Each structure stands twice: as C-alpha cells, then as structure tokens.
C-alpha cells in the first residue's frame, strides 16, 4: 500500500502542468490548416498562375468597360491608401517576424542565423525600391510634350502644351505579386516545423518557451494567409481598373524576375541563406 502511494507521489512530482500557450485554439487551428493548403503551393506554380491571371484579366479589361464609381476601386479608398500604398510596410511587419521567430525555433543554439534569415527581406526591399525607381524612369523617358521632348509635365502645362503620358509600369502589381512570392517561399519554414522543433526542444527542455514561440509563429503564419488573400483581391482591382495591358504584364514579369533571381539563383548559390526547408531527418 505504501509502495503504491510513494509511486503515485513520484509520478505526480515528475508531471509538469501544461503550458497555457499549448492549450488548443480551435479558430487558430482552422486558419492554420487553411494557410497550409494555400501557402505551401510551390512558388513556381504561384508565379505561373499570377502571370497567367494578370494576362487574362488585362485582356478582359481591354475588351470591357467597367464601372469605376464603386468606392473600393477608387484610388482614394482606405484599402488603397493604407493597404496597397503601404504594401511593402505590411510585408515587412508580417513576414519579418515570421522569419525571425521561425528561425529562432529551428536554430535554437545559433543566435546569428535569425539575423541572416531576416536579411532576405532587406534584399527584397532593395529589389522593390530599385524596381519602382526604374519604373518611374521608364515613365519619364517615354512621356513627352508636343512643345518639346525634354519638358517636364509641369513645364508642358505652363507652355499650354499637350502632355502624352508614357508607359507607367504597374508598381502596385509588381509589389503585390512579389510580396506573394516572398510569402510563399518563406512559409515553407512551417511545413515540418512541429516535428523538427519538437525533437530539438525535447533535448533542450524549455517546453513553455517552445509553446509560446509556436503560438507566435502560428499567428504570423495566419497573418500571411490574410495578406496573400488581400493582395489577390487588390490585384484584380489594379488590373481591371488601372494601367493598360502592357503595363500590368511588365509589372508582373518584373516581380517574377526579382523572385527568381533572389530565391532560385542567389540564395541557393550561397548569398545569404535559402528559407528553412528542414525535415525530421535533417536537424
């Protein structure tokens, strides 16, 4: 009898209370499951889809005149002013923390690796900035005034000339598709996250911190799903209501080129590091 009591006490002392962060959250679990279905699609397929999608929508726009009086499709709408125009900001504040926390979980003993991984967003920011500057340069070079080719738009207006706008490559289309491709590439860190990090943290022991980190990663993973969905909707509006066929296509192609050069050429070649693709067998 005493032996049974002592063994019961021993068992009770070895059991640790469950971490509040490990408590199942049904709503979060549903969104994580949906996000896995969308964000784990191969980036090459995503790139091809959006190239085809923009092409088809641009063709439709060139054949059909759409009603542009709806509030949500106007440039001064809240979603355009604080969503699309601040698009790269939202990419940084959502994808950045996901990369950071995922890298911390995967590389628990390497404090420098999260910094290296986040630097990929720095490269993406440079690609976005210089691409947009290039688009502006193309617009300036292809626009002209009938009073003189070297005149600016303001100077043309002063001379009462006729201003003919040039090719305004869609910076919004570029930004949104490039952001989607970055999200798709970086989301892969969560594919085998649970199996790999569980094995790592079983050795290190700090289960409560691991659960807290996991919950944080899941929130940003779901946030990337919502950002992807928002970009999808805004791409439709941008293509159907703004720019012309060639401007939208060039914006989409530029986004795919930037993604391919960075994620499929530079990172695999050793420039910084590719997104985390570890499996249980590769720790």
Swiss-Prot record:
Record-level GO cellular component terms: endoplasmic reticulum membrane
Top-level taxon in the UniProt lineage: Eukaryota
Catalytic activity field: an acyl-CoA + H2O = an acyl-4'-phosphopantetheine + adenosine 3',5'-bisphosphate + 2 H(+)
InterPro entries reported for this sequence: FIT, FITM1/2
Membrane topology: Multi-pass membrane protein
Entry GO MF terms: coenzyme A diphosphatase activity
GO BP terms: fatty-acyl-CoA catabolic process; lipid droplet formation; lipid droplet organization; lipid homeostasis; lipid storage; phospholipid biosynthetic process
Pfam families found in the cross-reference section: FIT (PF10261)
Keywords recorded for this protein, A-Z: Endoplasmic reticulum, Hydrolase, Lipid metabolism, Membrane, Transmembrane, Transmembrane helix
EC number: 3.6.1.-
Region annotation (Disordered) ranges: 1-21
Listed transmembrane segments: 40-60, 82-102, 121-141, 169-189, 220-240, 241-261
Cell location: Endoplasmic reticulum membrane
Extent of Low complexity compositional bias: 1-11
Cytoplasmic side: 1-39, 103-120, 190-219, 262-283
Keyword Cell membrane in annotation: no
Similarity-based family: Belongs to the FIT family. FIT2 subfamily.
Function: Fatty acyl-coenzyme A (CoA) diphosphatase that hydrolyzes fatty acyl-CoA to yield acyl-4'-phosphopantetheine and adenosine 3',5'-bisphosphate. Preferentially hydrolyzes unsaturated long-chain acyl-CoA substrates in the endoplasmic reticulum (ER) lumen. This catalytic activity is required for maintaining ER structure and for lipid droplets (LDs) biogenesis, which are lipid storage organelles involved in maintaining lipid and energy homeostasis. May directly bind to diacylglycerol (DAGs) and triacylglycerol, which is also important for LD biogenesis.
Name this polypeptide is given: Acyl-coenzyme A diphosphatase FITM2
Species of provenance: Caenorhabditis elegans
């Amino acid at each position: 009898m005493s032996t049974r009591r002592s063994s019961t006490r021993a068992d009770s002392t070895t059991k640790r209370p469950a971490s509040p962060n490990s408590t199942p959250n049904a709503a979060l679990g549903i969104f994580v499951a949906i996000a896995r279905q969308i964000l784990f699609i191969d980036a090459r397929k995503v790139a091809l889809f959006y190239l085809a999608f923009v092409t088809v929508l641009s063709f439709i726009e060139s054949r059909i005149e759409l009603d542009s009086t709806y509030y949500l499709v106007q440039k001064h709408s809240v979603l355009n002013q604080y969503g699309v125009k601040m698009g790269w900001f939202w990419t940084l504040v959502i994808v950045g923390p996901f990369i950071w926390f995922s890298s911390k979980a995967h590389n628990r003993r390497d404090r420098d690796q999260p910094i290296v991984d986040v630097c990929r967003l720095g490269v993406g920011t440079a690609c976005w900035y210089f691409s947009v500057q290039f688009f502006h340069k193309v617009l300036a070079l292809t626009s002209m005034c009938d009073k003189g080719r070297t005149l600016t738009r303001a100077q043309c207006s002063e001379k009462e000339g006729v201003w003919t706008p040039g090719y305004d490559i869609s910076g919004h289309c570029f930004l949104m598709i490039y952001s989607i491709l970055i999200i798709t590439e970086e989301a892969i860190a969560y594919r085998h996250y649970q199996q790999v990090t569980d094995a790592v943290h079983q050795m290190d022991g700090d289960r409560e911190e691991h659960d807290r980190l996991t919950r944080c990663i899941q929130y940003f993973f779901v946030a990337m799903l919502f950002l992807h969905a928002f970009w999808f909707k805004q791409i439709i509006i941008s293509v159907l209501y703004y720019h012309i066929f060639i401007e939208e296509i060039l914006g989409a192609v530029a986004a795919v080129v930037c993604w391919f050069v960075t994620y499929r050429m530079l990172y695999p070649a050793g420039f910084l590091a590719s997104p985390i693709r570890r499996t249980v067998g590769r720790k």
